[in-house]
Amino acid sequence: KIKGKKVNGKQMRTSTIERITNETKVNLVLNLDGVGRGKIKTNIPFFDHMLEQLTFHSSVDLELNARGDIDIDFHHSVEDCGICLGKAFMEALGDKKGINRYGFFLLPMDDALIRVALDFSGRSFLSWKVNFPSTRVGNFDLELVREFFNAFSTNSGATLHVEMLDGFNSHHISEAIFKAMGKSIKMAVAINKDVEIIPSTKGLSLIHISEPTRL
């Protein structure tokens, strides 16, 4: 069943996640039926900027506070944020009844052209066809962008394809990826009011919310 409280008679699709390890502490609150409002602090400015883009363009509301061993590097913090965001989507989507399930977007940003396709199927898979011209933007290691989306895919039970079609500016490429992901999420999690069923022909009758619902 959809998790969350009712507001004005409407069931809100929400999730609260806390993850504490020896390397990080992440607190996250997600509302799928938001307005694109983000309150994000990871102490990694470029990553914060990317998550703000994803939040705004997906129209979800996201509060995320992360503290990690960024004095060593950003890997643990970025990956754990992906883990928590993925788990939050899995929980907030519940049995996925009535959602579009699929989302896709082709997004241009100056020189960059990015295509993202997403399926909240319950089957985790990431296809990543991105070549950043540089290895870093400022002090942010760009290989962590893939790590973030891999963690998200694994923990949300999503099939995700990300493809770079053009681009020469690494900042633009990364930002276009997060924006296109946001647009794809917005499409996929939207409720189709004409179809009040689980979006699958498998005929699911028993759902365990602790695991991704495979469609």
Give the location of each predicted region.
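Structural preference for solvent-exposed beta-strand-turn elements
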Residues: 9-206
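Polybasic, lysine-rich low-complexity intrinsically disordered segments
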Residues: 1-2, 6
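Conserved small/polar residues in nucleotide/adenosyl-binding loops
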Residues: 207-215
